[in-house]
Design a protein with these regions (language model features):
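Beta-sheet-dominated scaffold domains
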Residues: 340, 347, 369-530
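N-terminal beta-propeller domains
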Residues: 1-78, 224-377, 438-457
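A short beta-strand motif characteristic of beta-propeller blades
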Residues: 26-35, 82, 88-92, 311-315, ...
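Short coil/turn segments that connect the beta-strands within blades of beta-propeller domains
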Residues: 52-54, 106-107, 330-331, 385-386, ...
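Amphipathic alpha-helical scaffolding segments
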Residues: 118-130, 340-355, 394-405
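Repetitive beta-strand solenoid architecture
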Residues: 40, 105-106, 322, 329, ...
């Protein structure tokens, strides 16, 4: 687009559609953080809380077997901030500059270490069939109940005037008389509860009545709710198999009103043999701004999985994989890992599990894969009005729903483009376009993308073509300012900051320009506070 006589290169200028080409604003020296190499290979981030409270921070690289550390300065007063580490938190800082992702939400910054594999807590030890229930559903004149337990048989016949309670009492006495070691039998309203402390209860059966249908026994599971007694022992957990399909079963726990046994109610619960959820030491950590100039790095208190098992309420897909980026969208906290996108419950950012194993609600977590015929490793995400634009090394995707509201049932991921891009430098949003880069061995190409919905390919332009080979491949930072309509690049091995600025009125682009600034020394990081 250059015309004869136009400027070939602009250093330390600032093109403006109103004032023309002016000098850039002057730099202000605020303070000295160290030598020119003190913070080399550190991950820098900028936090803007209010106009009067802003911070510049960095994560120093781990080296020589030692973990990294966090340093934060007040960007207004330049006071060094106090950093406190929660239990085991600093052990999470094992990476260097390119191994971290930082997402700030209000007073918290979510730090993700891309080197660490997310893990679940260990499955608890579960001893099957150490509890059992004998339930009678009918009694009549001289009803006979025949049962077996631990290879022993017993038989009880009721008298003319025996009640349910009397029949249960006789069955309890018959079992007690077998003298089975460490077996406790408790009589309740309509059943007997059996528990054994040192071994499984083997071969528990019972029949009753002329048609052998007036009594039944179960241990860790029942086929339907009808088999459950009206009372049980507190915290007694039973699996309801339902249709028999793995995804149709669920678990119920009995809650006694007095905390021991007797009257109470059943509530949905977690399988006793299943992990309670996420291992916080392997998950992203939070840097909390506790007060002015005070920060605490700590493990996040993730909400435990409360219901179901690995089939009906599975762990998020990132378990067993490395999380590459965190993001916030539609009132949900999300994570990228391999080819999957995992998002929290709506409004409950640290809850990655379903509320119930029996049904899916719109607020439940979302977990989808962007798999195609090509290998996919998602590394970046940009929220847009059409949904989430997902980026991998060679493909771009759009994750969204027809009505714009992301739910487990309605959300889909579709491929929208197939551009090669850099996986280290994240794309940025300028308000009207998304900019991303692609590197060659000697220079950097810059692209601008405008999404047009899930059913249309985006418009993509190579905006760096007019300055081909001008931006070196050594840049490591890309930022944007929607307010000032520019993007900027910097690298820790160069003094130059490279800018692209455009001005548009509607769809009519009035100004497009490339220029650079020369800093006094190599640029560690840049940020736009607008």
């Amino acid at each position: 687009k250059k015309l004869p006589g136009q400027v070939e290169e602009c250093i330390n200028g600032y093109p403006d559609p109103t004032f023309g080409l002016t000098k850039r604003p002057g730099f202000q020296h605020i303070g000295n953080l160290g030598t020119g190499t003190t913070y080399d290979n550190s991950k820098w981030f900028f936090i803007s809380r209010t106009d009067d409270e802003k911070y510049i921070g960095c994560i120093t690289p781990a080296s020589g077997g030692s973990t990294g550390a966090i340093a934060v300065w007040n960007a207004v007063t330049f006071a060094a901030c106090n950093i406190t580490y929660g239990t085991g938190a600093q052990a999470y800082l094992t990476g260097t500059r390119t191994d971290y992702d930082v997402l700030t939400i209000q007073d918290k910054s979510i730090l993700t270490n891309k080197l660490i594999t997310a893990a679940k807590t260990a499955d608890p030890t579960f001893n099957a069939n150490r509890q059992g229930t004998i339930k009678i559903s009918g009694t009549s004149v001289e009803t006979t109940y025949n049962g077996t337990i631990e290879g022993n048989t017993f038989s009880v016949t009721t008298d003319n005037n025996d009640t349910y309670s009397d029949a249960l009492g006789k069955i309890k006495t018959a079992i007690d008389n077998l003298n089975i070691s460490n077996l406790t039998v408790t009589k309740l309203k309509d059943n007997l509860h059996l528990s054994r402390t040192n071994a499984a209860i083997g071969g528990l059966t019972i029949t009753g009545g002329p048609f052998a249908n007036q009594a039944n026994a179960f241990q860790d599971q029942v086929a339907t709710l009808d088999e459950l007694p009206s009372e049980s022992m507190n915290n007694h957990v039973v699996k309801v198999v339902n249709s028999g399909a793995l995804t149709s079963s669920y678990f119920l726990k009995y809650v006694a009103n007095n905390g021991t046994s007797g009257p109470g109610y059943y509530e949905e619960t977690l399988s006793p043999s299943t992990s309670t959820g996420l291992d916080a030491s392997t998950m992203p950590h939070e840097l909390v701004n506790t007060s002015v100039n005070n920060f605490t790095l700590q493990r996040i208190s993730w909400v435990a999985r409360a219901v179901g098992d690995d089939d009906t309420n599975a762990h998020p897909s990132f378990i067993g994989n490395k999380i590459t980026q965190s993001f916030f969208h539609n009132n949900r906290l999300g994570f990228l890992s391999a080819d999957t996108v995992s998002m929290s419950q709506s409004g409950d950012f640290f809850n990655m599990y379903h509320t119930s194993a029996q049904t899916i609600t719109d607020s439940d977590p979302i977990d989808l894969s962007a798999s195609t015929v090509k290998p996919v490793a998602l590394h970046s995400v940009i929220p847009s009005t059409q949904g989430l634009v997902l980026f991998s090394a060679n493909q771009q995707f759009l994750m969204g729903a027809a009505d714009g509201i992301l739910t487990p049932a309605k959300t889909v991921i579709r491929t929208i483009a197939n551009y090669e891009m850099d996986t280290i430098i994240d794309p940025v949003d300028t308000g009207t376009t998304i900019n991303f880069i692609s590197k060659t061995p000697s220079y950097t190409r810059v692209f601008a993308m405008v999404t047009r919905g899930e059913n249309e390919n985006p418009q993509v332009a190579d905006i760096g073509r007019v300055v081909n080979e001008w931006i070196p491949s050594t840049v490591d930072t890309l930022i944007s300012s929607a307010q000032n309509q520019f993007i900027a690049f910097s690298g820790q091995t160069t003094r130059y900051i490279y800018f692209f600025r455009q001005y548009a009125e509607g769809k009519d682009i009035k100004l497009q320009t490339w220029f650079n600034w020369l800093a006094p020394g190599n640029v560690q990081t840049i940020a736009a506070d607008s």
